[in-house]
């Protein structure tokens, strides 16, 4: 795929995606994952240790919008892949940071943006998460540095999907 070795994950929860990402980057790769909730970070840390991948994962606890400037200052980018699965209301800011910490070819994935199928395309729906998902999709479409699309998923959890974009310059 994109042969990512340096990955940024925004939103860790229990570390399920983190474990898959850490396996994918291989022994020489690194995943930096940002989690707001210390309890979730502890659960993720335990799961990552159980998976014997702790040497590939750096868990940072706190608000992602506070952690991202520190990551930039520490020059830990550019990242090959940025996976965003956190508070939907800040997705546009997370994509801005993903762009700032990227290089041409970086893949940016924003999870859970389809929001029940037709909800995102319905301007009469006033739910904050739906409005945030709509905003990030519009941002990706308008950003000249990104080529992206939304992909719908349907399964036992219902109708949702994700946006995937590639940095082109």
Sequence positions of predicted segments:
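S-adenosylmethionine/decaboxylated-SAM
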Residues: 1-169
